UniProtKB/Swiss-Prot annotation:
E.C. designation(s): 2.7.2.3
Catalytic function, reaction form: (2R)-3-phosphoglycerate + ATP = (2R)-3-phospho-glyceroyl phosphate + ADP
Subunit structure: Monomer.
Gene symbol of the encoding locus: pgk
CDD domains: Phosphoglycerate_kinase (cd00318)
GO biological process: gluconeogenesis; glycolytic process
Lineage: Bacteria, Bacillati, Bacillota, Clostridia, Eubacteriales
Organism: Clostridium kluyveri (strain ATCC 8527 / DSM 555 / NBRC 12016 / NCIMB 10680 / K1)
Residues annotated for ATP binding in this entry: 206, 297, 328, 354-357
Metabolic or biological pathway, per its Swiss-Prot or TrEMBL entry: Carbohydrate degradation; glycolysis; pyruvate from D-glyceraldehyde 3-phosphate: step 2/5
Record-given protein name: Phosphoglycerate kinase
Binding residue positions for substrate: 23-25, 38, 61-64, 122, 155
Protein backbone atom coordinates (compact mmCIF):
# COMPACT_ATOMS: atom_id res chain seq x y z
CA UNK A 1 0.00 0.00 0.00
CA UNK A 2 1.35 3.38 -0.98
CA UNK A 3 0.76 6.08 1.60
CA UNK A 4 -1.60 8.55 -0.09
CA UNK A 5 -3.58 10.15 2.73
CA UNK A 6 -3.63 13.81 3.69
CA UNK A 7 -1.91 14.57 6.99
CA UNK A 8 -2.25 17.39 9.53
CA UNK A 9 0.40 19.30 7.58
CA UNK A 10 -1.85 19.41 4.50
CA UNK A 11 -4.59 21.49 6.17
CA UNK A 12 -4.70 24.92 7.80
CA UNK A 13 -5.52 24.36 11.47
CA UNK A 14 -4.97 27.89 12.80
CA UNK A 15 -7.89 28.98 14.98
CA UNK A 16 -9.84 25.85 14.01
CA UNK A 17 -11.50 23.36 16.35
CA UNK A 18 -9.75 20.08 15.62
CA UNK A 19 -11.28 16.81 16.84
CA UNK A 20 -8.49 14.24 17.27
CA UNK A 21 -9.16 10.52 17.73
CA UNK A 22 -6.23 9.21 19.78
CA UNK A 23 -5.54 5.76 21.17
CA UNK A 24 -5.48 6.25 24.93
CA UNK A 25 -6.53 2.66 25.63
CA UNK A 26 -3.85 2.29 28.31
CA UNK A 27 -3.60 -0.25 31.14
CA UNK A 28 -4.71 1.18 34.50
CA UNK A 29 -4.11 -0.17 37.99
CA UNK A 30 -5.96 1.63 40.78
CA UNK A 31 -6.23 4.74 38.62
CA UNK A 32 -2.51 4.73 37.72
CA UNK A 33 -1.32 4.28 34.12
CA UNK A 34 1.08 1.31 34.03
CA UNK A 35 2.24 1.69 30.41
CA UNK A 36 2.12 5.12 28.82
CA UNK A 37 3.59 4.27 25.41
CA UNK A 38 0.33 5.17 23.69
CA UNK A 39 0.24 8.58 25.37
CA UNK A 40 3.84 9.26 24.31
CA UNK A 41 2.95 8.16 20.77
CA UNK A 42 0.18 10.77 20.56
CA UNK A 43 2.32 13.74 21.64
CA UNK A 44 3.85 14.78 18.27
CA UNK A 45 0.39 15.31 16.71
CA UNK A 46 -1.02 17.13 19.77
CA UNK A 47 2.05 19.38 20.06
CA UNK A 48 1.97 20.23 16.34
CA UNK A 49 -1.69 21.28 16.62
CA UNK A 50 -1.03 23.34 19.78
CA UNK A 51 1.98 25.07 18.22
CA UNK A 52 -0.06 25.86 15.12
CA UNK A 53 -2.78 27.52 17.22
CA UNK A 54 -5.53 24.95 16.80
CA UNK A 55 -8.17 24.33 19.45
CA UNK A 56 -7.48 20.68 20.21
CA UNK A 57 -10.34 18.35 21.22
CA UNK A 58 -9.10 14.84 22.03
CA UNK A 59 -11.24 11.70 22.17
CA UNK A 60 -10.53 8.02 22.76
CA UNK A 61 -11.95 4.82 24.18
CA UNK A 62 -10.51 2.94 27.14
CA UNK A 63 -11.30 -0.72 27.79
CA UNK A 64 -14.69 -2.23 26.98
CA UNK A 65 -17.38 -0.50 29.07
CA UNK A 66 -19.94 -1.61 26.42
CA UNK A 67 -22.11 1.48 26.61
CA UNK A 68 -22.16 1.64 30.40
CA UNK A 69 -20.55 4.28 32.60
CA UNK A 70 -17.75 2.51 34.46
CA UNK A 71 -15.75 4.91 36.67
CA UNK A 72 -12.69 2.65 36.54
CA UNK A 73 -12.57 3.22 32.76
CA UNK A 74 -12.77 7.01 32.96
CA UNK A 75 -10.16 8.94 30.99
CA UNK A 76 -9.51 11.31 33.93
CA UNK A 77 -6.09 9.73 34.74
CA UNK A 78 -5.15 10.21 31.07
CA UNK A 79 -6.07 13.91 31.20
CA UNK A 80 -3.92 14.34 34.32
CA UNK A 81 -0.90 12.57 32.84
CA UNK A 82 -1.23 14.35 29.48
CA UNK A 83 -1.26 17.69 31.32
CA UNK A 84 2.11 16.75 32.84
CA UNK A 85 3.57 15.51 29.56
CA UNK A 86 2.41 18.60 27.62
CA UNK A 87 3.23 21.01 30.49
CA UNK A 88 -0.20 22.54 29.95
CA UNK A 89 -3.57 21.82 31.50
CA UNK A 90 -5.65 19.37 29.51
CA UNK A 91 -9.23 20.21 30.49
CA UNK A 92 -11.22 17.03 31.15
CA UNK A 93 -14.86 17.20 30.03
CA UNK A 94 -16.41 14.76 32.50
CA UNK A 95 -19.69 14.02 30.71
CA UNK A 96 -21.00 10.48 31.07
CA UNK A 97 -22.75 11.01 27.74
CA UNK A 98 -19.38 12.18 26.26
CA UNK A 99 -20.78 15.17 24.37
CA UNK A 100 -22.64 16.90 27.21
CA UNK A 101 -22.79 20.26 28.98
CA UNK A 102 -19.17 20.07 30.21
CA UNK A 103 -17.79 19.32 26.76
CA UNK A 104 -19.88 22.00 25.04
CA UNK A 105 -18.95 24.66 27.61
CA UNK A 106 -15.26 23.71 27.50
CA UNK A 107 -15.19 23.90 23.69
CA UNK A 108 -16.99 27.26 23.75
CA UNK A 109 -14.37 28.71 26.11
CA UNK A 110 -11.33 27.43 24.20
CA UNK A 111 -8.55 29.72 23.08
CA UNK A 112 -6.10 28.85 20.31
CA UNK A 113 -3.60 26.25 21.56
CA UNK A 114 -5.93 24.92 24.28
CA UNK A 115 -6.51 21.18 24.74
CA UNK A 116 -9.53 19.34 26.10
CA UNK A 117 -10.16 15.60 26.47
CA UNK A 118 -13.63 14.07 26.18
CA UNK A 119 -14.83 11.15 28.29
CA UNK A 120 -14.45 7.52 27.13
CA UNK A 121 -16.27 7.24 23.77
CA UNK A 122 -17.35 3.67 24.59
CA UNK A 123 -19.52 4.96 27.46
CA UNK A 124 -21.94 5.41 24.55
CA UNK A 125 -23.48 2.21 23.20
CA UNK A 126 -23.65 3.79 19.72
CA UNK A 127 -19.84 4.11 19.44
CA UNK A 128 -19.04 0.53 18.44
CA UNK A 129 -22.17 0.31 16.27
CA UNK A 130 -21.08 3.38 14.28
CA UNK A 131 -24.51 5.01 14.67
CA UNK A 132 -25.02 8.40 13.06
CA UNK A 133 -26.53 10.20 16.06
CA UNK A 134 -23.36 9.89 18.17
CA UNK A 135 -21.06 10.51 15.18
CA UNK A 136 -22.97 13.75 14.55
CA UNK A 137 -22.65 14.84 18.20
CA UNK A 138 -18.89 14.25 18.17
CA UNK A 139 -18.49 15.99 14.81
CA UNK A 140 -20.46 19.03 16.03
CA UNK A 141 -17.56 19.89 18.37
CA UNK A 142 -14.96 20.20 15.61
CA UNK A 143 -14.30 21.68 12.19
CA UNK A 144 -11.51 19.29 11.16
CA UNK A 145 -11.11 15.61 12.06
CA UNK A 146 -7.73 13.98 12.68
CA UNK A 147 -7.42 10.24 13.18
CA UNK A 148 -4.23 9.30 15.00
CA UNK A 149 -5.41 6.04 16.58
CA UNK A 150 -3.76 3.25 14.62
CA UNK A 151 -4.78 0.75 17.32
CA UNK A 152 -8.45 1.13 16.35
CA UNK A 153 -8.01 1.84 12.63
CA UNK A 154 -9.43 -1.61 11.83
CA UNK A 155 -12.72 -0.75 13.57
CA UNK A 156 -15.55 1.16 11.89
CA UNK A 157 -16.79 3.08 14.96
CA UNK A 158 -18.35 6.54 15.40
CA UNK A 159 -15.07 8.11 16.52
CA UNK A 160 -12.96 6.50 13.76
CA UNK A 161 -15.25 6.41 10.72
CA UNK A 162 -18.71 7.84 11.49
CA UNK A 163 -17.49 11.37 12.23
CA UNK A 164 -16.00 11.68 8.73
CA UNK A 165 -19.56 11.75 7.33
CA UNK A 166 -20.14 15.04 9.14
CA UNK A 167 -16.60 16.48 9.08
CA UNK A 168 -15.52 16.32 5.44
CA UNK A 169 -11.97 17.50 6.21
CA UNK A 170 -10.52 14.29 7.67
CA UNK A 171 -6.76 13.70 7.79
CA UNK A 172 -4.28 11.51 9.66
CA UNK A 173 -1.87 12.46 12.42
CA UNK A 174 1.83 11.68 12.68
CA UNK A 175 1.36 8.34 14.44
CA UNK A 176 -0.83 6.82 11.74
CA UNK A 177 1.44 8.28 9.06
CA UNK A 178 4.47 6.65 10.70
CA UNK A 179 2.68 3.30 11.09
CA UNK A 180 1.53 3.19 7.47
CA UNK A 181 4.91 4.24 6.13
CA UNK A 182 6.84 1.64 8.16
CA UNK A 183 4.44 -1.25 7.69
CA UNK A 184 3.63 -0.29 4.09
CA UNK A 185 7.28 -0.01 3.01
CA UNK A 186 8.22 -3.21 4.80
CA UNK A 187 5.56 -5.13 2.92
CA UNK A 188 5.74 -3.45 -0.49
CA UNK A 189 9.39 -2.52 -0.79
CA UNK A 190 11.51 -4.42 1.75
CA UNK A 191 15.30 -4.60 1.87
CA UNK A 192 16.02 -8.30 1.36
CA UNK A 193 16.35 -10.93 2.71
CA UNK A 194 12.91 -10.24 4.21
CA UNK A 195 11.91 -12.42 7.18
CA UNK A 196 8.57 -12.62 8.97
CA UNK A 197 8.26 -14.23 12.40
CA UNK A 198 4.81 -15.34 13.50
CA UNK A 199 3.92 -16.66 16.93
CA UNK A 200 0.98 -16.53 19.29
CA UNK A 201 -1.65 -19.17 19.90
CA UNK A 202 -3.94 -19.40 16.89
CA UNK A 203 -3.33 -20.10 13.23
CA UNK A 204 -6.89 -18.86 12.58
CA UNK A 205 -5.95 -15.33 13.75
CA UNK A 206 -3.15 -15.19 11.21
CA UNK A 207 -4.54 -16.88 8.09
CA UNK A 208 -4.68 -13.69 6.02
CA UNK A 209 -1.26 -12.67 7.29
CA UNK A 210 0.32 -16.01 6.34
CA UNK A 211 -1.36 -15.93 2.91
CA UNK A 212 -0.21 -12.38 2.25
CA UNK A 213 3.32 -12.79 3.62
CA UNK A 214 3.97 -15.97 1.62
CA UNK A 215 3.69 -13.73 -1.46
CA UNK A 216 6.34 -11.33 -0.10
CA UNK A 217 8.91 -12.89 2.26
CA UNK A 218 12.11 -14.88 1.75
CA UNK A 219 11.85 -16.64 5.13
CA UNK A 220 8.84 -17.37 7.35
CA UNK A 221 9.52 -18.41 10.95
CA UNK A 222 6.74 -19.97 13.02
CA UNK A 223 6.69 -20.42 16.80
CA UNK A 224 4.25 -20.14 19.68
CA UNK A 225 1.05 -22.14 20.10
CA UNK A 226 0.28 -22.03 16.38
CA UNK A 227 3.40 -24.12 15.65
CA UNK A 228 1.73 -27.24 17.13
CA UNK A 229 -0.93 -27.16 14.43
CA UNK A 230 1.92 -27.11 11.89
CA UNK A 231 3.66 -29.96 13.77
CA UNK A 232 0.49 -32.05 13.45
CA UNK A 233 0.38 -31.16 9.75
CA UNK A 234 3.91 -32.61 9.45
CA UNK A 235 2.75 -35.81 11.14
CA UNK A 236 4.38 -35.30 14.54
CA UNK A 237 2.80 -36.06 17.92
CA UNK A 238 2.18 -33.03 20.14
CA UNK A 239 0.98 -34.50 23.45
CA UNK A 240 -1.58 -32.21 25.10
CA UNK A 241 -0.33 -29.06 23.32
CA UNK A 242 -2.83 -26.56 21.96
CA UNK A 243 -3.98 -27.42 18.43
CA UNK A 244 -6.60 -26.25 15.94
CA UNK A 245 -7.84 -29.49 14.39
CA UNK A 246 -9.75 -27.64 11.67
CA UNK A 247 -6.58 -25.81 10.54
CA UNK A 248 -4.25 -28.82 10.12
CA UNK A 249 -5.17 -29.12 6.43
CA UNK A 250 -4.52 -25.40 5.95
CA UNK A 251 -1.10 -25.75 7.63
CA UNK A 252 -0.26 -28.60 5.20
CA UNK A 253 -1.20 -26.37 2.26
CA UNK A 254 1.02 -23.57 3.56
CA UNK A 255 3.98 -25.93 4.00
CA UNK A 256 3.51 -27.03 0.37
CA UNK A 257 3.04 -23.46 -0.87
CA UNK A 258 6.28 -22.32 0.80
CA UNK A 259 8.16 -25.24 -0.79
CA UNK A 260 6.66 -24.44 -4.20
CA UNK A 261 7.67 -20.77 -3.95
CA UNK A 262 11.17 -21.51 -2.65
CA UNK A 263 10.45 -19.75 0.64
CA UNK A 264 12.29 -20.97 3.72
CA UNK A 265 9.63 -22.03 6.21
CA UNK A 266 11.25 -22.63 9.60
CA UNK A 267 9.38 -24.71 12.19
CA UNK A 268 10.55 -25.88 15.63
CA UNK A 269 12.94 -28.87 15.81
CA UNK A 270 12.98 -29.11 19.61
CA UNK A 271 10.68 -27.92 22.41
CA UNK A 272 10.47 -26.99 26.04
CA UNK A 273 7.54 -28.94 27.49
CA UNK A 274 5.85 -29.53 30.84
CA UNK A 275 2.95 -31.50 32.29
CA UNK A 276 0.82 -28.60 33.56
CA UNK A 277 0.04 -25.04 32.42
CA UNK A 278 1.45 -23.24 35.42
CA UNK A 279 4.08 -20.62 36.17
CA UNK A 280 5.80 -22.97 38.61
CA UNK A 281 5.78 -25.93 36.18
CA UNK A 282 9.17 -27.51 35.59
CA UNK A 283 10.57 -26.90 32.09
CA UNK A 284 11.64 -30.16 30.40
CA UNK A 285 13.67 -30.17 27.19
CA UNK A 286 12.13 -32.39 24.48
CA UNK A 287 15.03 -32.86 22.07
CA UNK A 288 12.78 -34.15 19.33
CA UNK A 289 10.04 -32.99 16.97
CA UNK A 290 7.57 -35.31 18.74
CA UNK A 291 6.08 -34.53 22.15
CA UNK A 292 5.19 -37.41 24.49
CA UNK A 293 1.67 -38.05 25.76
CA UNK A 294 0.74 -36.06 28.85
CA UNK A 295 3.12 -33.20 28.03
CA UNK A 296 2.44 -29.87 26.38
CA UNK A 297 4.78 -27.59 24.45
CA UNK A 298 5.39 -24.24 26.18
CA UNK A 299 8.33 -22.76 24.25
CA UNK A 300 10.73 -23.43 21.39
CA UNK A 301 13.88 -25.32 22.40
CA UNK A 302 17.51 -24.09 22.28
CA UNK A 303 18.31 -25.73 18.90
CA UNK A 304 15.28 -24.06 17.33
CA UNK A 305 16.18 -20.73 18.95
CA UNK A 306 19.66 -20.96 17.38
CA UNK A 307 18.29 -21.76 13.90
CA UNK A 308 15.81 -18.86 14.18
CA UNK A 309 18.48 -16.44 15.47
CA UNK A 310 20.81 -17.35 12.58
CA UNK A 311 18.03 -16.70 10.03
CA UNK A 312 17.30 -13.36 11.71
CA UNK A 313 20.97 -12.32 11.59
CA UNK A 314 21.02 -12.94 7.82
CA UNK A 315 17.98 -10.68 7.24
CA UNK A 316 17.70 -7.03 6.20
CA UNK A 317 14.00 -6.55 7.05
CA UNK A 318 12.22 -8.39 9.86
CA UNK A 319 8.58 -8.23 10.94
CA UNK A 320 7.58 -10.00 14.15
CA UNK A 321 4.09 -10.68 15.43
CA UNK A 322 3.45 -13.05 18.33
CA UNK A 323 5.69 -14.61 21.01
CA UNK A 324 7.53 -17.94 20.65
CA UNK A 325 6.15 -19.43 23.86
CA UNK A 326 4.36 -18.63 27.09
CA UNK A 327 6.71 -15.70 27.77
CA UNK A 328 4.61 -14.51 30.74
CA UNK A 329 6.03 -17.53 32.64
CA UNK A 330 9.74 -16.99 33.31
CA UNK A 331 10.61 -20.66 32.70
CA UNK A 332 9.15 -20.49 29.19
CA UNK A 333 10.40 -17.09 28.00
CA UNK A 334 13.80 -18.14 26.63
CA UNK A 335 12.65 -18.66 23.04
CA UNK A 336 10.98 -15.25 22.86
CA UNK A 337 14.07 -13.70 24.49
CA UNK A 338 16.40 -15.36 21.93
CA UNK A 339 14.36 -14.00 19.01
CA UNK A 340 14.17 -10.51 20.54
CA UNK A 341 17.93 -10.49 21.21
CA UNK A 342 18.74 -11.65 17.67
CA UNK A 343 16.53 -8.90 16.26
CA UNK A 344 18.11 -6.27 18.50
CA UNK A 345 21.58 -7.28 17.29
CA UNK A 346 20.67 -7.82 13.62
CA UNK A 347 21.31 -4.32 12.26
CA UNK A 348 18.21 -4.91 10.08
CA UNK A 349 15.00 -2.89 9.82
CA UNK A 350 13.01 -4.42 12.67
CA UNK A 351 9.27 -3.97 13.00
CA UNK A 352 7.22 -5.32 15.89
CA UNK A 353 3.56 -5.83 15.05
CA UNK A 354 1.96 -4.64 18.28
CA UNK A 355 0.06 -6.67 20.87
CA UNK A 356 1.88 -9.40 22.81
CA UNK A 357 5.14 -9.06 20.85
CA UNK A 358 5.34 -5.37 21.75
CA UNK A 359 4.72 -6.24 25.41
CA UNK A 360 7.38 -8.97 25.25
CA UNK A 361 9.97 -6.70 23.60
CA UNK A 362 9.43 -3.95 26.17
CA UNK A 363 9.36 -6.39 29.08
CA UNK A 364 12.67 -7.92 27.93
CA UNK A 365 14.24 -4.46 27.61
CA UNK A 366 14.82 -4.45 23.83
CA UNK A 367 12.22 -1.79 22.96
CA UNK A 368 14.70 0.97 22.12
CA UNK A 369 16.69 -1.37 19.83
CA UNK A 370 13.80 -1.84 17.37
CA UNK A 371 13.23 0.36 14.32
CA UNK A 372 9.49 0.50 14.90
CA UNK A 373 7.07 -0.93 17.45
CA UNK A 374 3.53 -0.77 16.14
CA UNK A 375 0.86 0.65 18.45
CA UNK A 376 -1.84 -1.54 16.91
CA UNK A 377 -2.19 -5.27 17.56
CA UNK A 378 -5.31 -6.13 15.55
CA UNK A 379 -4.82 -3.23 13.14
CA UNK A 380 -1.26 -4.18 12.24
CA UNK A 381 -2.33 -7.82 11.79
CA UNK A 382 -5.12 -6.84 9.40
CA UNK A 383 -2.77 -4.48 7.54
CA UNK A 384 -0.13 -7.22 7.22
CA UNK A 385 -2.92 -9.46 5.96
CA UNK A 386 -3.47 -7.04 3.08
CA UNK A 387 -6.83 -5.81 4.33
CA UNK A 388 -8.25 -2.30 4.07
CA UNK A 389 -8.48 -0.50 7.41
CA UNK A 390 -11.81 1.40 7.62
CA UNK A 391 -10.36 4.14 9.85
CA UNK A 392 -7.74 4.89 7.18
CA UNK A 393 -9.98 4.49 4.12
CA UNK A 394 -12.32 7.15 5.56
CA UNK A 395 -9.61 9.86 5.47
CA UNK A 396 -9.03 12.33 2.62
CA UNK A 397 -6.67 11.28 -0.18
CA UNK A 398 -3.85 13.59 -1.21
Amino acid sequence: MVFNKKTIEDVDVKGKRVLVRCDFNVPLQEGKITDENRLIGSLPTIKYLMENNAKVILCSHLGKPKGEVKPEMSLLPVAKRLSELLKKEVVFAADDNVVGENAKAAVKNMKDGDVILLQNTRYRIEETKNQDNFSKELASLGEIFVNDAFGTAHRAHCSTVGVTKFLPTAVCGYLIQKELEFLGNAIENPSRPFTAILGGVKVSDKINVINNLLEKVDTLIIGGGMSYTFARAQGYTIGTSVVEEDKIEYAKEMIDKAKEKGIKLLLPIDRVVTDKFDESAEPILEDDKNIKDGYMGMDIGPKTAKVYADAIKDSKTIIWNGPMGVFEFKNFAKGTFAVAKAMAESGAITIIGGGDSAAAINQLGFGDKMTHISTGGGASLEFLGGEELPGISALNNK
